[in-house]
């Protein structure tokens, strides 16, 4: 397919005074790379001495252009997007048009300046770079100053975009695969791609007329001979012919692989034309004589030769046989690499029925076909059907599936035959993965034995998991250790466990301080020492609240009389509400009275009088209100303690 790209570059140079044309292709694997794909320079078009003399081509300038393109290819065969003139154009998406007489070095980076100096030293006066997303970049150079033409820029981009619709058209000849080049030998790019009316396409030896004819995306056409732009000179034929206005000649662009057979087959009506005496033959005469026979296989399958773009010239049967031969050889290589591919359990039953239908239709058809053409078609399809290509019968029940349309464009002969093997291979692999019968284990198909033992009432058929059993055992142990945790829920049990652990942590923390606590001084002295009257005029002269200092600092001993109310736990809550930590709490009986004694620790510097006044306030409100202790505590917390710096003798 590289002939199409090369023909497009040649058309740009020859008809628009460009000295060279280069197509940089965006890398398929890495889009940040631009790869030198194809190049054309005017040295190739001026190899004929007669043409050099007639056109006045400067051979020395052509040699400089040739050396320039060779140096460009050797130095920068692969460039990064964003580097250099071509890379910057691909990155920005804007074309660049640089003239030697107006080149400004201040607006370009050093790498671009070096490139332009190299171009100018080779005699190039104009350099143009056109990015064509997503295919690549076109670079043009001319030894003449050419003014910027936006119409030409758009036409070049449109030409490359249309070439991109042809599979493999933007690949050079070095990267061609099994696609036969004979399908496009002698066919200029204007026959493959619709004309845009610009000079770039009108310059081809074969110019496609802007008519209702549609060309397919695979690059094959029906090769209808069309008119060319006016030309008064008839040059010598180099494997082709030149034409005058309204009459046909074959182009000088590309020479078929077998020129003699091609000319005898398609232009036998011109065998008597003398080279010195050119005859003008209308297009319709030649197109009526050039065909040796129609392709009845395509006719029977509903594809018209003229409308679908199938080619009948150049020995269609032979070329298609070569295509299928290459496809089948590729398939055999795949089959050798994957032995399971040919034995996946599917046969070509659908294709065999298709072949029978085609052959029977050919016998009953009203068209007369040559034995040679039908035999070649039958042999070709027989080779395909007898191969071990795996496809289900429902995948191709009718022949119309062989000629599906892509994007609304009919498929040409190369894609019809060339891509069918690939589609069969893909279908077979997908069906092998999805639709092939799954190997079922015998143990899966066997019915489970009905030998379960009947369980007794209350038995659990499945044992409890080991981790769950261990959790249940630990919860049971916690219920035995934590006070009042026998009948609470698991979350309440965990909460009690946390509180119990904090309590034990405080006990271990203050264990040394508990050893230093002493007894009450009131009980040691006769008469009880100084006391505080709870109520004036009461019979009891014993103070119900006593607060003493105990070494070390911030350790106090609080004693409260709780005989009448029995508020031991409430007293403990009151003490905690004052921000004190209870280190020890006991209930003692003294002279027929019950006392609650607490050893507490303060977290800040407080006096015993401050603690005493708070406890008196709490006790007074309790006796007066006789209400809930929690409500009383909430009210006490709202009152700030009075700072007392002096001591109180007990």
Swiss-Prot record:
Residues 381-417, 431-470 are annotated as: Disordered. GO terms for biological process: maintenance of root meristem identity; positive regulation of DNA-templated transcription; regulation of DNA-templated transcription; root development; stele development; xylem development. Residues 384-397 have a biased composition (Low complexity). It is found in: Nucleus. One of its GO terms (cellular component) is nucleus. Keywords: Activator, Developmental protein, DNA-binding, Nucleus, Transcription, Transcription regulation. Expressed in both root and shoot meristems. Present in root tips. It comes from the Eukaryota. Pfam families: bHLH-MYC_N, bHLH_LHW. A motif (Nuclear localization signal) lies at residues 451-458. GO terms for molecular function: DNA binding; DNA-binding transcription factor activity; protein homodimerization activity. Disruption phenotype: Loss of bilateral symmetry and reduced number of cells in the center of the root, resulting in roots with only single xylem and phloem poles and defect in lateral root formation. Residues 455-504 form the bHLH domain. Residues 456-470 have a biased composition (Basic and acidic residues). Transcription activator that regulates root development; promotes the production of stele cells in roots. Coordinately controls the number of all vascular cell types by regulating the size of the pool of cells from which they arise. Homodimer. Can also interact with bHLH proteins. Belongs to the bHLH protein family. LHW subfamily. This is Transcription factor LHW.
